[in-house]
Amino acid sequence: MKRFSEERGGGWEQHDLPNGGRASGAGSVELWVQRVVGVGILLGSLLTASGVTAPPPKEPVSEPRIGGLPLFADWPKDRRPAVTVVISGQTYGFLQPCGCTRPQLGGLERRAQFVQSLKAKGWPVVGVDLGDIYPQQMYVRQQGLLRYETIMHALQAMGYLAVGVGKTDIEAELDKLLTAYALQEERPPYLLAANLLGQVDGKVISRQERFQPAGLNRPLIDRFEVAKVGEVSVGIVGLIGRSLAEEIENNKLEPSITFVKNAQGKIDNGAVLQEVLLGLEQHPLRPQLLILLYQGSAEEAALLARDFPQFQVIVCRSEESEPPQFPTRSKNGSTLIVQVGHKGRYVGVVGAFPQRGGSWQLHYQLVPLTEYYLAPGSDAEALRNNPVLPLLQTYAERVRDRNLLEAVSKRPHPVQIQHPDLNLTYYGSHRCQNCHAADYLLWAKSAHSHALDTLEQKARRPNLRHFDPECVICHSVGLEYQSGFVSASKTPALKHVGCESCHGPGSGHATNPQHAGLQLLMSPWKQEAADRLPSLETMKKLASLPLVEQRQAEQALPISQRRTVERVASMCMKCHDHDNDPYFNLYVYWPKIAHGMKP
């Protein structure tokens, strides 16, 4: 993950990390760790999510830089862009950074603040989004719809003109999404997918028939949109790529839609674009700048750029969550192919500067949405001045009022599946203290023991996150599992991150502590009963090393210890993942909560 100058302190408390292991002799390894020097090869293990062992030092929050340069460093200084296009996509329902650690990137509050900063320069600004607004997965489907609706209203507040239609949007049952926003709002941002048609019982029907409810003047999903931005007429076209369209049809992700095809029954996006370009030529505003929102790969986008050089900008899907710093130029040099990554951590900005003869000089800037773009002032001031924050607060209130926390579907925990005869249930950490008194006291002093309180007391912009299943799942015990957390009032013993968050439902072990099979079940990271983490002393020494040396040193650990470290880290990263804790490192975190082992 890229590192930018950004303040680290404050925010929520850093959550520690639970686990259970036992001591192992590794004296030779410990001596080797003391002696290790030099540079090694980075290994692709799961020990850190970001490639660094600790957050950057605390510094004043400054404007982000890319490649060591300030934003827009190579843009003309003597004139403003005739139009500025802010580009986002593949947001996947991401509203705000969770705040569990800092710094983090992205969020609608920061994006809105950034857009305001461009407008404050006097630049004409318009926003476009590739699509995939709906989350990739949600514990409660209704909450996914709320996120979609909230993001669409946020884009409207920021001045977006158009949004493409992506795979997650189609998987979410398209009509429910249309009902949540497009049916209610006959104004930008408009949904665009030029090759989309309807289908009833295998019979193809027109776009107008499939997506034109009575009373509205345009299809809920249209082919293109044209608007005046400043003095420039901008045309936006949406298109679902051939590969994705075939996947949608082959997997029957949405049986009520199909795509424009040729006489041989093949998806024919070329014919679609030819027809669309003709329609744009005949449009009263005669667009001067054309942008294609293309739900396909960069390779497919390059072919379209070759065949349709009329588009100055093509926005395509990002396979990786981190976007490339620079766009790709088509072979003829007339088209920028842009990718902006996932979850709104970054936006792309295209500035169009007119040249003689009617052509454009295009400049591009990738912008990381760092804490620099947090709305300034108190929370109350930010709520008044940032157009998105009231929407986020309303969203949080709706999640609470609809009691979505208790709507989470419960599934069997893996150990409940393996041993249905034992009727294993969650007990609560307080039940562990009789036999594990020292470990319980250590847990009680850790941040894990009040994780849900932290969510309630410190989460803000919006608050009320202790009612949000997507947050509570990592601040409670067993929310998604049978007999797990339901709510603070109904299951108070399962509040916070407790012993069973990692060890699994403990009723069987508590009632029969000598049962060897149950003991092994309580340590799911063990491949073999004898597997152990390195000694605490070794873990601390590894934590003190720079990352490259740390990676080199861990190769001297016994294979069973390396395997255990990796399996434990992968369990921790279910919550301490790249989004929520980009500086997670097991060697650094484990000593904070080391238990079940000798020093």
Q: Each predicted region: which residue ranges?
A:
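Bacterial N-terminal signal peptides
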Residues: 36-46
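Acidic, metal/ion-coordinating pockets
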Residues: 54-371
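Intrinsically disordered, glycine-rich low-complexity segments
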Residues: 7-14, 22, 26
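N-terminal Sec signal peptide cleavage junction
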Residues: 50-52
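A short C-terminal boundary segment appended to hydrolase-like catalytic domains
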Residues: 79-81, 347-431
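Sequence context of c-type cytochrome heme-c attachment sites
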Residues: 389-566, 584-599
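Bacterial N-terminal signal peptides that target proteins for export
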Residues: 20, 25-37
